[in-house]
Amino acid sequence: VTAPQCVPSRAGLLSGRYQNRFGVESNAESVAPFAAERTIAERLKEAGYVTGMAGKWHLGDNTKIAEHGFDKVFFKHSNAPGFWNMDLEGKDIEPAEQRGGGYHLDLIADFACAFIKRHARQPFFFYLAPRAPHTPLDAPPKYTSRFPGEMPERRRQALAMISAVDDGVGRILATLREHKLEERTLIFVIGDNGAPLKIHKLDSPLPSDPGGWDGSLNEPMNGEKGTLCEGGIRTPWLAYWKGAIPGGQVFAHPVISLDVAATVVALAGLEIRPGELDGVNLIPFFTGENKAAPHERLCWRWTAQSAIREGKWKLLRGGPREYLFDLDADPGEKQNLLDTHPEIAKRLRDHLQAWGADLQPPGVESNSLGRAASNYFDYYLDGKPAARPAPAQESQEPAARREERNKRRGIQANQ
């Protein structure tokens, strides 16, 4: 994905452009620039598709999601009230705050099924965004009971929430099959960022420490959410299109969430200007028609961190720190080869700086390396003893103060 954090990662996914090009850099900054971007939904709507979304938004006002190209909206990411304009029977309702009963991960999948049933004879695009696994951890007993035995309670909750998502995906697939749409539907399943381990993976009592470990894991990758290590940006990615993409294969080359927009726009027959999107159409690569790698290089910038990958080589920077890894030989990013291959590091550094010149603001970093990121680099990359990272301390901030701060930044609370 394009960032080790949810807001910029989702902005990149839905726009098909590096979010750094339009100034959505991290969760801590305003998402206002995203409003000027054309989303996948807006593009497909112009091509005659009906569009829908359900779940977490996190890209601005939850009552204005429809303005980003979504015809049918079911914003709900917790057991608190949500906002939607179609009910679970597929009937239009007045857009307003709603208080539907049931577990939010079940409800968003049910909404997706209702959307598919209603629009089975039309071309459609649906964006399902479960908040799972993610704090606050809130799986009900019907899911936690599937994972008995001794384990951290936060781990049990994460597995339970993933199980709920899995059930929902199963219901969606069953609905597609019921309406004979399975061979006409391309499905991507992608994580938005790596697991937030907070180094120590503290199993603090629930529901305390809402900004703490969410029970997910990154092994065997190094790092976590908030770093441009593989553990922060390398997430699960599944592509399914029965009869078109051969099943059971592991694609050997790197891809990125930006490719989703480029792929679906190409399949819809829409024309785009050169450079308008940053991804590529993956279908020729997944089918084997094109044997090359989809990308010569991939780049990232997240606040004071930046990285570039070219084949097996990855250059990672964090403030004044710099690392070079051979990901084929060292997928856990443990051996810094900067001194061994200075010529490779220079080539990658030059490409990264050229890429950064087109960002907003320009450059390979947009902020200073904060305390939390410094702790992560100390522990994951420099082998220093683990310090308690800043995010866990920041989670003690009073909720009212945190929500007011988030409102000023254009971030909806509890997302």
Provide a role label for each language-model segment.
Residues V1-E322, A329-D350, A354-A357, P361-N367, ...:
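Formylglycine-dependent sulfatase
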